[in-house]
Amino acid sequence: MRQAEIVRETKETKVRLAVNLDGTGRASIATGIGFFDHMLDLLARHARFDLEVEAKGDLHVDFHHTTEDVGIVLGQAIRRALGDMRGITRYADLHLPMDETLTRVALDISGRPFLVFRTEFKVGKIGEFDTELVREFFQAFASNAGVTLHVETLYGDNAHHIAESCFKGLARALRAAVAIDPAAAGEIPSTKGALGG
């Protein structure tokens, strides 16, 4: 089974996260941040990962540390669950519509962390959630998953829809990229014979 569980504890947060890449989309999410829980729930559902997240953080300060640290741990867990990445599809790209919004996501599970994030929000908050934290989550995730990730919102007005299209786009790209390619016969999808840098 391609699964992993990680616990990360700092002076700012404690995060326990478990992921099963070959799941059914079941999610149990509790970060103390309602909007972020919603984004993680739909990420699990659309990636069809089973995902458990328990996070306790310094929410009295703001939501930054918790959001970033969950991104760190999710990235680490997916990287660990993939193992040597043998047989995976590796690449995925798609356009994700959410009402008036359209976001393009391209992903390479390469072992080389890089993020291009071209998404702008017209407001600073969605409820109590700072919209700048969407990028912080994606940066933390890409850096720790070891993936090259491009996220670009081509157009959109509603901040909730923009954020949701980014998370759903990541979910669908992950679902496609981690899928086992039956034609690859268990090969590592790289001419170098290894992924990881």
Swiss-Prot record:
Reactions catalysed: D-erythro-1-(imidazol-4-yl)glycerol 3-phosphate = 3-(imidazol-4-yl)-2-oxopropyl phosphate + H2O
Alphabetical list of SUPFAM superfamilies matching this protein: Ribosomal protein S5 domain 2-like (SSF54211)
Pathway(s) served: Amino-acid biosynthesis; L-histidine biosynthesis; L-histidine from 5-phospho-alpha-D-ribose 1-diphosphate: step 6/9
UniProt keywords, alphabetically: Amino-acid biosynthesis, Cytoplasm, Histidine biosynthesis, Lyase
GO molecular function: imidazoleglycerol-phosphate dehydratase activity
Pfam families named among the record's database cross-references: IGPD
Annotated GO biological process: L-histidine biosynthetic process
EC id: 4.2.1.19
Family listed: Belongs to the imidazoleglycerol-phosphate dehydratase family.
Cited PANTHER family: IMIDAZOLEGLYCEROL-PHOSPHATE DEHYDRATASE, IMIDAZOLEGLYCEROL-PHOSPHATE DEHYDRATASE HIS7
Protein name as annotated: Imidazoleglycerol-phosphate dehydratase
Upper lineage: Bacteria, Pseudomonadati, Pseudomonadota, Alphaproteobacteria, Hyphomicrobiales
Gene (name only): hisB
